[in-house]
């Protein structure tokens, strides 16, 4: 759900120095999809091992997590569980998009007349994150000594709940739904920052982390969180992907400001009832009362298992052994320093 137009005035760029010593609960699937999309070979295909198994996600997870730790940030990766039934339509839509992209990709390869940029586009659109890839990602993170949380349902909701409980300073995702789930602070671009090529253009831009604070956003807009959720429902969420036809985010904001709720706007005829083909209260409840649990997992950094990391990356997936060993050295050093920064941040709160 895209709230970009509404957050434009209150979002602010962050330096990594401002995040030093802080724990961030990360929507793991969101991060893994970013790695799968960004870490590609020149023809758009993902990195693969000698057996043809995709490794882009492991490459991104290992090296990007080390970079985050080197900035003094402690990541907590939160993985999806079983999605709500109401998400079935959106998941089916995504599946069809991937299948169509795969067909176009194969057709383009056969014809051999399409631009490399088009090949990349179709390759990225056909990205799949399998259960096996997710499990292997958890295994790697645990071997690295990084906190991993298994959500009962939506990882994004659980990451937001960890933030609500005060167990993390912010949640990190590209998706604004984190705000609807009640995250106090949302950081975008945490796992994406650096120079990135614009899609379909030979232009590179500097991507920096940005912070959106829920309370600041709600005060600026003069809304409650429930009303922000209603705007999301009008525009479309994962639980009603089509939203209400003909209404953009600015119109949705105007309507909710005027009537206070989606039901009232329907009752007064501002939004024709015939256009609403979903249960408003049910969808709102999925954001206000998502299936979440207080994590039982240890949320602190622990010692890494170097042999396990080498086994996963080098022995199983053909990563360069020297590079991985160098990464492990960086990892251990960064974790020591990040722990120190976290303790200092805790002390600073008392003075």
Curated annotation (Swiss-Prot):
Q: Where is this region: N-domain?
A: 1-98
Q: Which cofactor names does the annotation list?
A: Mg(2+)
**Leading EC class:** hydrolase
Q: Which domain of life is it from?
A: Archaea
Protein family (similarity comment): Belongs to the XPG/RAD2 endonuclease family. FEN1 subfamily.
Locate the region Interaction with PCNA. 343-351
Binding residues for Mg(2+) 1: 27, 80, 154, 156
Q: How is the cofactor bound?
A: Binds 2 magnesium ions per subunit. They probably participate in the reaction catalyzed by the enzyme. May bind an additional third magnesium ion after substrate binding.
Q: Which organism is it from?
A: Sulfurisphaera tokodaii (strain DSM 16993 / JCM 10545 / NBRC 100140 / 7)
Binding of Mg(2+) 2, residues: 175, 177, 238
What SUPFAM superfamilies does this protein's entry cite?
5' to 3' exonuclease, C-terminal subdomain (SSF47807), PIN domain-like (SSF88723)
Keyword set, alphabetical order = DNA damage, DNA repair, DNA replication, Endonuclease, Exonuclease, Hydrolase, Magnesium, Metal-binding, Nuclease
Subunit arrangement? Interacts with PCNA. PCNA stimulates the nuclease activity without altering cleavage specificity.
The record describes the protein's role as: Structure-specific nuclease with 5'-flap endonuclease and 5'-3' exonuclease activities involved in DNA replication and repair. During DNA replication, cleaves the 5'-overhanging flap structure that is generated by displacement synthesis when DNA polymerase encounters the 5'-end of a downstream Okazaki fragment. Binds the unpaired 3'-DNA end and kinks the DNA to facilitate 5' cleavage specificity. Cleaves one nucleotide into the double-stranded DNA from the junction in flap DNA, leaving a nick for ligation. Also involved in the base excision repair (BER) pathway.
What is the recorded name of this protein? Flap endonuclease 1
- Leader peptide range in chain numbering: none
List the Gene Ontology MF annotations in alphabetical order: 5'-3' exonuclease activity; 5'-flap endonuclease activity; DNA binding; magnesium ion binding
List every stretch annotated I-domain. Answer: 118-260
One GO biological process from the UniProt record?
A: DNA replication, removal of RNA primer
> Might you give the EC number(s) for this enzyme?
3.1.-.-
